[in-house]
Every structure is written in structure tokens, then in C-alpha cells.
């Protein structure tokens, strides 16, 4: 029996909750949001769909964090959404304050919960939440970029997506790093089957398509929600899938979250970072340095703001 809490049930939160619940991953689901009536009305919607499917999941919608208790997994989507032309880092201060508040309120009533950060900038928010909560936290990281990578290569080379393997690592978003040594099509290295498809084109797609989707559709939802559901599924059923999610590491004395391919199950790890070739590790190390520099600048400003 797995109890899962969904913190923030706006557009992406609703899609994630639907995906998780209808994959049979939660025996009980708690839907929380600050918007009056939203969790309650979303609860009704889900109950109608659950009845149609004949599931037994119990759903509770609430505007009170006091009702979020004894959850096994807590997914955090609460935060301001990314708007067209806005980078994920632009969101840092406002959304970090939300995570600090949640970090103070959630842990006392949810001992042993696994926290999965979804709110952007997702890796930095995971680092902020873990810093203030002292609870093990992961972020969805580059799991989404990884599937964008595979899907684009599959489309361009006209092969099924399940015939493409490979991972994206580093920070989620514009600074993500494609681990080209891991990219294979039908088991063959990318370079052998590229047929004129360049690495630059693939990388540009992976980094630019989210902004294009946001510009036209107002947000990315279905791709991320399905991938996040897969992360939850691998944890709940201890599947041990290798996924590129962001896990905590200490760098320059600060906890930061960086994505690397890692085994995801009831326990998180080990990672495959140690078996990557030097070329990939160098690019990943630079991503870590860049992430830390920007995160530390934002964190220092945040701490001054919080003190005020």
C-alpha cells in the first residue's frame, strides 16, 4: 500500500497525478494546492475517472498541509510556472521561498518519505528543499531530456523509439549534456547510423523544444508527466531502471543536484558516472561547476532575502 502526496495540482500537477494514479501506483493519493476549491474539485474529477476504471485508489483533496500525513512519496510541483521567454533560473527566488516553506512543514508529519522535486528550476529547487528540510530529495532532472533525445533520433532516423538508447546528464534545461558515448540505435553507436543527422542538431532540439512547446501550448505536461510516472513506478515496484535523474552530491561544501544515469528502485543508486569515458566526464564536470556557480549566487541572494 503506497500513499502518494501531490503538492501543487495545477496543470502539470493534475497531469502527473492522473498518470500516477491510473498506472495503479497509489493506494491513497493526497492532492494539495493553495488555490481554494481546486484540490476538492480535482478530487471529484479523479473519483469519476477512478469509478470508470474500477480502481480502488482513495483520493483526498485539501487546501491544508496539515492533511498531508504519512506519505511514502511526495511529489512537489508547487511553484510559479515558467512563461514564454523565461529561463528556469528566472524562477529561482519566488519558487525557492515556496520550497523553504514546504521544507519546514512537510517532514514532521511524513517520516521517511521520499521527496521528488518537479517545480522549476527543478535541480536547484531540489537542492534548496533538501538544504532546509534535511530530507533525502531527488529531482526529475534530465529524465525528460533523455526521452526527448531518444524520440528525436528515432523520428529522424525512422526507427521505433525503443530502439534508441542513450542519456542526457548535468543540469535539467538549457545546460544539459548529451552523453554521446551512451547513444546507440539498434545497438550501434550513433556515429555509425547517423545518416547526416548531426549531434549539434540533436542537442539543439533537446534544448529548444521545451520553449517551443511552452510558446504554443502554454506548458509541457504530457511528456514530463509520463516520465515522472515512470520514476515513481520504478521506485514503488523496485524495478531498478537506469534513469537520468538528479540526486544529491556535495560540491564545495554545498549540496547540489546533478543528473547522471542511475539505478532507480526502492533504493536510489548506484550511478553509472564512474564508467563513463573521459570525454563525457569532462563535460559533466563542467556542468557541475557551472551549476554550482549559478546556484551559489542565487542561494546567497535568497538567504539575504529570507533574513530580511
UniProtKB/Swiss-Prot annotation:
Alphabetical UniProt keywords: NAD, Oxidoreductase, Tricarboxylic acid cycle
EC number(s) reported in the record: 1.1.1.37
Pfam families: Ldh_1_C (PF02866), Ldh_1_N (PF00056)
Domain of life assignment: Archaea
Single GO molecular function: L-lactate dehydrogenase activity
Residues reported to bind substrate: 82, 88, 120, 148
Enzyme class: oxidoreductase
Binding site for NAD(+): 8-13, 33, 95, 118-120
GO biological process, one term: lactate metabolic process
Enzymatic reactions: (S)-malate + NAD(+) = oxaloacetate + NADH + H(+)
Function: Catalyzes the reversible oxidation of malate to oxaloacetate.
Family: Belongs to the LDH/MDH superfamily.
Entry protein name: Malate dehydrogenase
Biological classification of the source: Archaea, Thermoproteota, Thermoprotei, Sulfolobales, Sulfolobaceae
Amino acid at each position: 500500500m503506497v500513499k502518494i502526496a501531490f503538492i501543487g495540482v495545477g496543470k502539470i500537477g493534475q497531469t502527473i497525478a492522473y498518470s500516477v494514479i491510473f498506472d495503479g501506483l497509489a493506494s491513497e493519493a493526497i492532492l494539495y494546492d493553495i488555490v481554494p476549491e481546486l484540490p476538492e474539485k480535482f478530487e471529484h474529477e479523479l473519483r469519476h475517472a477512478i469509478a470508470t476504471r474500477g480502481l480502488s485508489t482513495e483520493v483526498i483533496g485539501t487546501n491544508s498541509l496539515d492533511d498531508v500525513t504519512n506519505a511514502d512519496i511526495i511529489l512537489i510541483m508547487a511553484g510559479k510556472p515558467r512563461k514564454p521567454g523565461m529561463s528556469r533560473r528566472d524562477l529561482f527566488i519566488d519558487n525557492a521561498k515556496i520550497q523553504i516553506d514546504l521544507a519546514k512543514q512537510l517532514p514532521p508529519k511524513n517520516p521517511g518519505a521520499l521527496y521528488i522535486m518537479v517545480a522549476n528550476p527543478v535541480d536547484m529547487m531540489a537542492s534548496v528543499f533538501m538544504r532546509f528540510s534535511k530530507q533525502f530529495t531527488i529531482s526529475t532532472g534530465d529524465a525528460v531530456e533523455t526521452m526527448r533525445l531518444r524520440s528525436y533520433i528515432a523520428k529522424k532516423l525512422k526507427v521505433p523509439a525503443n530502439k534508441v538508447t542513450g542519456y542526457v546528464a548535468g543540469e535539467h534545461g538549457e545546460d544539459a549534456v548529451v552523453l554521446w558515448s551512451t547513444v546507440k540505435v539498434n545497438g550501434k553507436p550513433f556515429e555509425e547510423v547517423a545518416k547526416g543527422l548531426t549531434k549539434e542538431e540533436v542537442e539543439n532540439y533537446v534544448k529548444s523544444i521545451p520553449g517551443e512547446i511552452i510558446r504554443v501550448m502554454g506548458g509541457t505536461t504530457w511528456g514530463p508527466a509520463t516520465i515522472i510516472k515512470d520514476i515513481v513506478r520504478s521506485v514503488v515496484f523496485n524495478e531498478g531502471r537506469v534513469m537520468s535523474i538528479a540526486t544529491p552530491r556535495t560540491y564545495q561544501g554545498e549540496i547540489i543536484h546533478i543528473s547522471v544515469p542511475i539505478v532507480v528502485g526502492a533504493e536510489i543508486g548506484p550511478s553509472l558516472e564512474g564508467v563513463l569515458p573521459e570525454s563525457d566526464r569532462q563535460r559533466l564536470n563542467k556542468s557541475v561547476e557551472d551549476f554550482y556557480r549559478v546556484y551559489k549566487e542565487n542561494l546567497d541572494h535568497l538567504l539575504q532575502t529570507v533574513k530580511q
